[in-house]
Amino acid sequence: MDVEKLWNHTKKDSIFQTTHFSSSSKPFFTRSFSTKTSSSPSSKSHFTRSFSTKPSSSSSSSDLIFRRSFSAKPKTSKSLLLSRSCSTKSSADLSSKSSSLSRILSKKGASVTGKCFKVAKEHKSRFYIIKRCVLMLVCWHKHS
């Protein structure tokens, strides 16, 4: 088999370099990958990547479509730290599940934060009491 017949390679813009791979035998999954770089050589480069895997049009519409995206961008132009996000989603009942899930997670996060705050406050008060007792004993020992 000839490699050129199996893989088609296309490039679009010079700023947006996009590569699409597809097989001539109609694969079940198609892939796309894009990279965006800044056009000025003096500024630091910013990369944005996206990757999606979907069933081809020959598959039935009842199949689930899975999407995955990844992005890496500096928070400021001078910062070297990268902010990343990655998610995998299914298209079935996504809107109702995601809203209830985010509410549940925010309630759990608030309750955990409240518990941690209470434990830290108790620990601080115990430490203060013990510190006062030790100081009192030291002073009592010196004066007796």
Curated annotation (Swiss-Prot):
Which residue positions carry a glycan here?
N8
The record, for InterPro entries, names: DVL, DVL_RTFL_polypeptides
Give positions of region: Required for DVL/RTFL small polypeptide activity.
111-142
Record key words, sorted: Cell membrane, Developmental protein, Glycoprotein, Membrane, Transmembrane, Transmembrane helix
Choose one Gene Ontology CC annotation of this protein and give it.
plasma membrane
- The ranges of region (Disordered) come to 22-63
* Bilayer-crossing regions: 104-120
Disulphide bridges, residue numbers: none
Q: Report the Pfam families cross-referenced here.
A: DVL (PF08137)
Membrane-topology descriptor: Single-pass membrane protein
GO BP, one annotated term: negative regulation of cell population proliferation
Q: List locations, semicolon-separated.
A: Cell membrane
Family to which this protein belongs: Belongs to the DVL/RTFL small polypeptides family.
Outline what the protein does: Small polypeptide acting as a regulatory molecule which coordinates cellular responses required for differentiation, growth and development, probably by restricting polar cell proliferation in lateral organs and coordinating socket cell recruitment and differentiation at trichome sites.
Cross-referenced PANTHER family, in alphabetical order? DVL13, SMALL POLYPEPTIDE DEVIL 15-RELATED
Protein's name according to its UniProt entry: Small polypeptide DEVIL 15
Q: Which organism is it from?
A: Arabidopsis thaliana
